[in-house]
């Protein structure tokens, strides 16, 4: 759940620290030549036709000839912005065709926040919540179908391989919905600090959609979300077992928002651990 008690209030500019640069250099040195050759990425701003209009989005894929599995990335409550473009580039460099949509296209063009945005400012926060409220369940399902169809229309997409979807904050719940909306296509779901919206008492709770899916799940929860609703992880595990869906549910030692660079609670160590788990998920299931 994204609220003033959980979500990081300060959105900071993302700059590469010396420590981060050193880590990236060390990782690059350990990669095989084939992985380094794939590090060049093609990036495009695209428009995706949906049932409700046209969504502005960012598309990424490896440079050169070839075809790769499709991945849909749902951003957090603050939408498509540089931090998620960075994420799209990184995924594409690992060998995927990646679409990062503006989830709020019905209300505003991305980016929907500026450099001065402060989540602690009630007026600014309520504006984002208003954008989210404009997204109905049916609308989200239709969007997910349109996004996967768009990915499959790209010549770089390996259509014979399964697709993945990952989401952050509110995007966790949207990823669950995507897996249910396109069950024959989505084989892997990653939810990162998805908050307490994954299990609710409502009839449209995302966890109730699990039996309609054919995916393997990775659910990485924030420690402060878990403190608010400690039973949720057990409810999720039970739902996965009942639906016979493979899943990993883990509470990370970091707060809500820890995976997204540029936020006050970004935790590099735990973010990299979550990314490694995501990489393993995709390598095993997008085949």
Name each model feature, range by range.
Residues 1-16:
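N-terminal secretory signal peptides
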Residues 68-76:
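Short beta-strand element of the alpha/beta-hydrolase
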Residues 116-164:
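Gly/Ser-rich "nucleophile elbow"/oxyanion-hole loop immediately N-terminal to the catalytic nucleophile
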Residues 16-30:
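N-terminal export leaders
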Residues 241-287:
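C-terminal catalytic histidine-bearing segment of alpha/beta-hydrolase fold enzymes
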Residues 144-206:
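Primarily recognizes the serine-hydrolase "nucleophile elbow" in alpha/beta-hydrolase
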Residues 213, 219-221:
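Short beta-strand/loop motif that positions the catalytic acidic residue
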Residues 35-63:
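N-terminal cap/lid segment of alpha/beta-hydrolase-fold proteins
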């Amino acid at each position: 759940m994204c609220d003033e008690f959980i979500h990081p209030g300060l959105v900071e500019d993302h700059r590469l620290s010396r420590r981060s640069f050193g880590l990236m250099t060390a990782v690059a040195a350990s990669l095989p030549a084939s992985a380094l050759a794939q590090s060049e990425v093609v990036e495009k701003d695209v428009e995706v036709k949906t049932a409700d209009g046209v969504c502005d989005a960012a598309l990424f894929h490896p440079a050169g000839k070839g075809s790769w599995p499709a991945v849909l990335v749902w951003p957090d409550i603050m939408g498509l912005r540089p931090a998620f473009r960075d994420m799209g580039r990184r995924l594409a460099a690992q060998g995927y065709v990646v679409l990062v949509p503006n989830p709020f296209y019905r209300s505003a063009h991305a980016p929907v926040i500026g450099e001065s945005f402060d989540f602690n400012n009630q007026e600014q926060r309520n504006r984002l919540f208003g954008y989210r409220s404009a997204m109905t369940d049916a609308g989200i399902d239709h969007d997910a179908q349109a996004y996967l169809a768009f990915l499959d229309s790209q010549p770089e997409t390996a259509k014979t391989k399964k697709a993945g979807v990952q989401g952050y904050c509110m995007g966790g719940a949207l990823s669950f919905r995507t897996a249910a909306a396109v069950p024959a296509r989505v084989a892997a779901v990653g939810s990162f600090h998805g908050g307490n919206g994954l299990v609710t008492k409502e009839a449209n709770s995302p966890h109730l959609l699990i039996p309609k899916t054919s995916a393997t799940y990775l659910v990485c929860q924030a420690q402060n979300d878990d403190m608010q609703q400690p039973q949720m992880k057990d409810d999720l595990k039970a739902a996965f077992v009942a639906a016979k869906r493979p899943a990993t549910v883990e509470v990370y030692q970091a707060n809500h928002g820890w995976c997204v660079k540029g936020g006050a609670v970004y935790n590099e160590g735990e973010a990299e651990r979550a990314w490694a788990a995501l990489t393993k998920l995709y390598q095993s299931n997008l085949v």
